[in-house]
Amino acid sequence: MAVPDHWIPHAREDGEVIGWIDMHTAAPDLIPIDRLGRPLSAVSEWPDAEEALERRGLRFLMNRFRFEERTVRIRSLDDHRIVVTTAASDAVGDVGEEFVLDFPAGPELAESP
């Protein structure tokens, strides 16, 4: 799946998209959508949706996640897929297993506590 047409991109000052604002699903409320395609709490005002996305940002993508009982990290993502790996780093010898997931991320990819 790709980014739905009714998701409006929200970018940082440098132009990097950090999420979207869904104006359709919960209208008249707005749903901020993070970079993994996951909904945040609905809000009623556009500035509140932008603020929620700014707070969430991209930093959370550096966290560890759980996938199929494995600890993984996000290696790359775009508007069509998410690549996760069990490798601890991108060092040459640190191979690990890679998994390609559909975008948006489903519940099988969970943030580690």
Predicted regions mapped to residue ranges:
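Residue-level signal for glycine
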Residues: 15, 37-38, 106
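SH3/SH3-like beta-barrel fold
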Residues: 31-33, 82-86
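Acidic, aromatic-enriched beta-alpha/helix-loop junctions
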Residues: 28-63
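Short, charged, intrinsically disordered terminal tails
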Residues: 5, 96-113
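Short beta-strand-centered aromatic/proline hotspots
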Residues: 20-22, 70-78
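Short, hydrophobic/aromatic-rich segments at coil-to-beta transitions
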Residues: 2-10, 58-64, 82-83
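A short macromolecule-binding patch
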Residues: 42-43, 90-100
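Short N-terminal "domain-start" leader segments
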Residues: 1-23, 113
